[in-house]
Structures are given as structure tokens and as C-alpha cells.
């Protein structure tokens, strides 16, 4: 967005996902259209981005996370990475895998083990 707005010079530092994992679907746009006018949104659909976003959201949902939970996921096209952490920052677990549901379950198990 900053690049398209001509504000790229305002970027002080760009974080890579291995430094700071973003929330699922960060940067993706969603379109809502009236029933019967789905063709309008279809023109803007990028299948690869949609698949990545769906994988990221599946990880977060399997963990049981939401907008306020310390859960993140990122798919760069080749690697799916998920993260779960304690709300107080006392622990953090980052894992990667190919199956979004399995990765989410793994992270949910980690969170449950820390909750005991």
C-alpha cells in the first residue's frame, strides 16, 4: 500500500516473516458484493493468494485463535509457518508444515500442554 501511495520512503524497516510472523491474511483484501454480482469480485480474485490465505486461516482456526489471540500464520507459497505464544510472552512455539489442519492441531497441543 505504501508503495502504491508513493510513501515507500516512509518505511523505516521492513520485517521479514522469520523475524515477525504476521497475523493470518495480513495484507490480503476481501471484496463483498451483492448476490448475483459475484462476477465483479471474480475479476479481482488471485487464486494463489486465496489458497495461501485459506491455509493461514485454517491454522489459526485449528488452534482456536482469533484477532486477539497470540496466534499467527504465514504461507509464502512454498512454506506454511504457524506460531502460538503465551499471552504474557513466557513461551512461544513456531512450527512449519504442509497440512494447515495438522499444523494447527500441533500448535493447539503445544498451547494445551503449556496451559496444564
Regions found by a protein language model. Give the residues of each.
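Small-molecule-sensing regulatory modules
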Residues: 1-116
